[in-house]
Amino acid sequence: MEKFKKAGKIASKVRKKAIKAVKGEMKILDLAEFIENEIEKMGAKPAFPCNISVNEITAHYSPPCNDDRKILPGDLVKIDIGVHVDGFIGDTATTVLVEGYEDLKNYNDELAEKNKKMIEAAESALENAINTIRDGVEIGKIGEVIENTINKFGFKPISNLTGHTIDRWVLHSGLSIPNVKGQNSHKL
């Protein structure tokens, strides 16, 4: 259990550093390399290639070594970080609205507000889901809480992305926690 905790703590620290590192005009690949280097500096290894998904790319994009695309002010950047310590995995993600869009002449303020609201919805859904988790709760109930929270913000959750259990050396093991109400009556 201690190595799971260590991996989780490193993932959390790296996530915080990644949030501060995201800048307009930065290459996606440079951000991925920064994140993976920070993981290694802290004595761990990446559990999977860092995922950096921009705007309409919802999740799981890892930039190839020749990717020269840049993150721009106003972009919505989703960062998914995996850390392992001897195969014990910590997995975390966050979403960042890249600063500097306020100075752009052609930037859509309405889109910026919608993106801020989307980040707030995701953070609230996560918090509500965590508060729902307890011994004996049905997995479908957790998904229902997530879906209801996101809907209250005027958004629809992505049904084919889930939370998941992790085991040593196995990133997606056993149970999946849906983002939507489901028929899963399996209990924690």
Swiss-Prot record:
It comes from the Archaea. It catalyses: Release of N-terminal amino acids, preferentially methionine, from peptides and arylamides. It is an enzyme of class 3 (hydrolase). GO terms for molecular function: initiator methionyl aminopeptidase activity; metal ion binding; metalloexopeptidase activity. InterPro entries: Creatinase/aminopeptidase-like, Met_Aminopeptidase_Type2, Pept_M24, Pept_M24_MAP, Pept_M24A_MAP2_BS. Keywords: Aminopeptidase, Hydrolase, Metal-binding, Protease. Its cofactor is Co(2+); Zn(2+); Mn(2+); Fe(2+). Gene3D superfamilies: Creatinase/methionine aminopeptidase superfamily. GO terms for cellular component: cytoplasm. A divalent metal cation 1 binds at D80, D91. SUPFAM superfamilies: Creatinase/aminopeptidase. Removes the N-terminal methionine from nascent proteins. The N-terminal methionine is often cleaved when the second residue in the primary sequence is small and uncharged (Met-Ala-, Cys, Gly, Pro, Ser, Thr, or Val). Belongs to the peptidase M24A family. Methionine aminopeptidase archaeal type 2 subfamily. PANTHER family: METHIONINE AMINOPEPTIDASE 2. This is Methionine aminopeptidase. The gene is map.
